[in-house]
């Protein structure tokens, strides 16, 4: 099958980490990496990079940045019920496919 993978989690969603060192923490998805089945979440799974001085980073030193988390370790947080929830898909009357919260049946997008 050609084309891009589809995930229940997208950019700018608020998610909660289900397993791992940041379990229970939540943040906003900055980027989804489809080829590796991972997502980068704001201020979660932080790593330290030792950088040499270069043209872009003149001073160098130790930088902290977000590291990708596997998509299976994330759960979407519903905006209405503010709980981590599973996501379903349904087709509206105007033939538009949308995501919905399985707990409160609220349309997410």
From Swiss-Prot:
SUPFAM superfamilies: Translation proteins SH3-like domain. It comes from the Bacteria. Pfam families: KOW, ribosomal_L24. The keyword Cell inner membrane does not apply. One of its GO terms (biological process) is translation. Keywords: Ribonucleoprotein, Ribosomal protein, RNA-binding, rRNA-binding. CDD domains: KOW_RPL26. One of its GO terms (molecular function) is structural constituent of ribosome. Signal peptide: none annotated. GO terms for cellular component: ribonucleoprotein complex; ribosome. Part of the 50S ribosomal subunit. One of two assembly initiator proteins, it binds directly to the 5'-end of the 23S rRNA, where it nucleates assembly of the 50S subunit. One of the proteins that surrounds the polypeptide exit tunnel on the outside of the subunit. Belongs to the universal ribosomal protein uL24 family. NCBIfam families: rplX_bact. This is Large ribosomal subunit protein uL24.
């Amino acid at each position: 099958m050609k084309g891009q993978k589809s995930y229940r989690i997208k950019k700018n969603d608020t998610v909660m980490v289900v397993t791992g060192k940041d379990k229970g923490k939540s943040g906003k998805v900055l980027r989804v990496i489809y080829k590796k089945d991972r997502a980068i979440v704001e201020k979660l799974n932080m790593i330290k990079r030792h950088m040499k001085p270069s043209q872009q980073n003149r001073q160098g030193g130790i930088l902290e940045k977000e590291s990708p988390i596997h998509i299976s370790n994330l759960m979407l947080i519903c905006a209405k019920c503010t709980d981590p929830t599973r996501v379903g898909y349904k087709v509206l009357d105007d033939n538009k496919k949308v995501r919905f919260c399985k707990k409160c049946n609220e349309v997410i997008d």
